[in-house]
């Protein structure tokens, strides 16, 4: 991925790395996972033509220091890292995009530091888990049962949720089998994107910690009323991970929120519907696309 690599040293001596891509108003981007280093965001459907994307490599991913204690992969620490990044950048407020798990971190940060967020973009994420959303997820998966890749992909998903991966390399192999599930339609464009993720090295400790200790009782809803920033919530209507019902719950709880549901898109909205994604974000920013 093109761009300029940079990093900061945190108060406790860790490296926190990031990459700058494009030019224009700065948009801090927190990747998903947890445990993905940001390569999956690429240029976010060409947003780098109009914005400077500052793509964080979250703790334990990419060039950022890996914590010795897996307990450090929690929202409190992820939020603290974002605040250290803001201070390092010398900005009173940051515009913040969170994708998937990064959206959870972004909501937690915007609730903890409401005065520090100018605009908040939440992409393919959710703020809670309950039986209703679990049922929505299962319905979304059931819609894909006729696809030729489904049996292997679903088996990989079940293995991942049960933490049946020994290390980073095993998780990378698991995710390679899962990826088709994450698209509303798995065609040539989506397969080409998945090929770009072939060298991606995820952090197994971070995902294992989330699946075992965070996800079972995950609920950020009590914090959402504290978010003061204008907020754009983007969802794909075929996203089994973060279904539209999850996006509607967020938009209904944040005081100044706009909801956009993209027809036909799955989890990677910016890959499957780049024009719709780019248009929604630039409109929210009040920035026109460059010729």
What does each model-found stretch correspond to?
Residues 257-291:
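Catalytic active-site module of serine/aspartate enzymes centered on a nucleophile-bearing elbow/loop
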Residues 92-136:
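Conserved hydrolase catalytic core segment
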Residues 227, 233-235:
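Short beta-strand/loop motif that positions the catalytic acidic residue
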Residues 141, 152-222, 229:
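Alpha/beta-hydrolase
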Residues 121-161:
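Flexible "cap/lid" loop of the alpha/beta hydrolase fold
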Residues 7-67, 71, 85:
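Conserved HGGG/HGGXW glycine-rich cap/lid loop of the alpha/beta-hydrolase fold
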Residues 238-242:
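Acidic catalytic loop of the alpha/beta-hydrolase fold
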Residues 58-101, 279:
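Active-site loop/oxyanion-hole signature of alpha/beta-hydrolase fold enzymes
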